Amino acid sequence: MKGSNTFRWAIAIGVVVAAAAFWFWHSRSESPTAAPGVAAQAPHTASAGRRGMRDGPLAPVQAATATTQAVPRYLSGLGTVTAANTVTVRSRVDGQLIALHFQEGQQVNAGDLLAQIDPSQFKVALAQAQGQLAKDNATLANARRDLARYQQLAKTNLVSRQELDAQQALVNETQGTIKADEANVASAQLQLDWSRITAPVSGRVGLKQVDVGNQISSSDTAGIVVITQTHPIDLIFTLPESDIATVVQAQKAGKALVVEAWDRTNSHKLSEGVLLSLDNQIDPTTGTIKIKARFTNQDDTLFPNQFVNARMLVDTEQNAVVVPAAAVQMGNEGHFVWVLNDENNVSKKRVKIGIQDNRNVVISAGLSAGDRVVTDGIDRLTEGAKVEVVEPQTTVADEKSPSRHEGQKGARA
């Protein structure tokens, strides 16, 4: 029994030793092949990487050619449309409102009848004044006849000098009374005329402030209706104080400075007008100055209190080198562009920019007309890399400059 157990233990130990020997032999046989494989793989990968950079697909980019153009310079600001005149129409006499002769929102001309106050009392007052004037005119005529008789009698000493002077004084007094009567007639006529309320200016009427049948007074602050003059209409916008010298210089040159009004999104031009005036002082809290422009507004595209973006043309730069705005990048060293040579190799070039908008940028220094610049695919570029221009080149000359939908930067130099 003991010998049998010893035999079984010997067999088990032999199996374990055999398995260990097999594992050791197998691992030793694979190790020499694996290591050279790994060692060989690294140079192969590096070599393949270099070949990929040299012989692999080229980075696709889009490009444009710098051109020369006459580029307008704009100054931009935010503004609000204001009526050229705003008038609250009030009655100048007291009475009952018996008629309104306008439709709310209607365009009216100066002198058009807007409302009617009951004229009855004013007609009566006028008739009374006219009657008193007629009475005093008759009195004056009689006094003048008496004076003429006194003057004849005085020549023969039939009346005293005192009586003659008294009659002359009566005539003078009656003449003074008549002047007062004439003034009363004019006043009564004026009151009657004022019962017809007319438009003091041309413009658009707003909503009525009082209904027919109400008793109104000259002291009413709300008035009857408000008229805003919109033909022409004004735009008040602000510019930084640093732009004042540019505007004043352009004015002194005798230029009629054109001002454009654009919508809130700066994508649609609403109207075009001219500079009217500058304010006489700078706002110390904002460092800006108010500027007023005037627009004919015959198409009613501008409305009082409307918010707009204003652009004022102050100068035009001739023969400016222009590239698309997408080509200009900003780095630690300043603005730069990627320039393409004849072999489509790219190189970074520092530039100095001038007038710019959302589409185009004037290059003041660093580029020449005819240079090709990368406009898309810039993030994949390295110095000296060869690239592939994937789309036909487009020249900036094919685009209007400045853009007709530029933002605020489109006005800055």
From Swiss-Prot:
Listed GO MF terms: efflux transmembrane transporter activity
UniProt keyword terms in alphabetical order: Cell inner membrane, Cell membrane, Membrane, Signal, Transport
Protein's membrane topology: Peripheral membrane protein
Domain of life according to the entry: Bacteria
Any Gene Ontology CC annotation: plasma membrane
Positions of region (Disordered): 31-57, 391-413
Biased composition (Basic and acidic residues): 397-413
Record carries keyword S-adenosyl-L-methionine: no
Cell compartments where the protein resides: Cell inner membrane
Keyword Membrane: yes
Pfam families given in the database record: HlyD_D23 (PF16576)
Endpoints of the signal sequence: 1-20
Family: Belongs to the membrane fusion protein (MFP) (TC 8.A.1) family.
NCBIfam families reported for this sequence: PRK11556.1 (NF008589), RND_mfp (TIGR01730)
PANTHER family the UniProt entry points to: MULTIDRUG RESISTANCE PROTEIN MDTA
Assembly: Part of a tripartite efflux system composed of MdtA, MdtB and MdtC.
Name listed for the protein in its UniProt record: Multidrug resistance protein MdtA
Organism: Salmonella typhimurium (strain LT2 / SGSC1412 / ATCC 700720)
